[in-house]
Amino acid sequence: MGKLEAAISPKTKLMLINTPHNPTGKVFTRAELECVADILRRHPHVIAVTDEVYEKLVFDGREHVRLASMPDMWERTITISSSGKTFSCTGWKVGWVYGAAHLVRAVTLANQWIVFCICTPAQRAIATILKEADEPYMGFPDYYAYVRSHYEKKRDDLAESLKLANIKPIVPEGGFFIMADTSKYEVPEKYVQQPGPTGESPVTRDWAFARWLTVEGGITPIPPSAFYQPETAHNAANLARFAYCKEEATLVEAKARFRKLGSSLH
């Protein structure tokens, strides 16, 4: 927390907080967010913008805590959420922002220059399902309990599949993705030298690994250096992000491919 506070200057306008976090799956605890709130209280010129699009997808009995719910934070927090993650319809770009009136007004004024038009049928559909999601569903007390259980199992299944390939999963506390350690593999040089998406060559190891695994293993991860600042991207060299928001048949096939990949190391 000391490094976080040290990064604040008189020119700082906002602090962006993402929980559950993408790509790591970290869910910030109440105690951790209280520390963040304390920092913000000491710097009244800074507002908080919280990305909480995975708020309903927290696992192992964890609690999703909203920074805006803490003392003195409502007036200083813009909360962002989304229907696409919660209801497994990521192509429906329908989300919402809420907070104190003066903050929402500023968002509204900016938004009119960002979004040309909206998809009213999708908005009406999401408004309806938000009401129905609190009702009992598939033997669970509500839809949210069902979807948590559903994705928690997918997470566990993919984590076990990764282990078959000697890829060490960093088991997420929430969200759609598993970050994993791929350092057991030596990536062929040709995948390092092939130009990257913007023509750069050589590419970073995580890009080369993602390419190699796609071509040779039939499995495509995301190279996580895309989530880093250039000066810290080296920390992602031995990492890859895998998604478990997939149909069961896809995860079963992936398991078979991971098993085959693991056997190649022996």
Name each region found by the language model:
Residues 1-266:
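PLP-dependent class I/II
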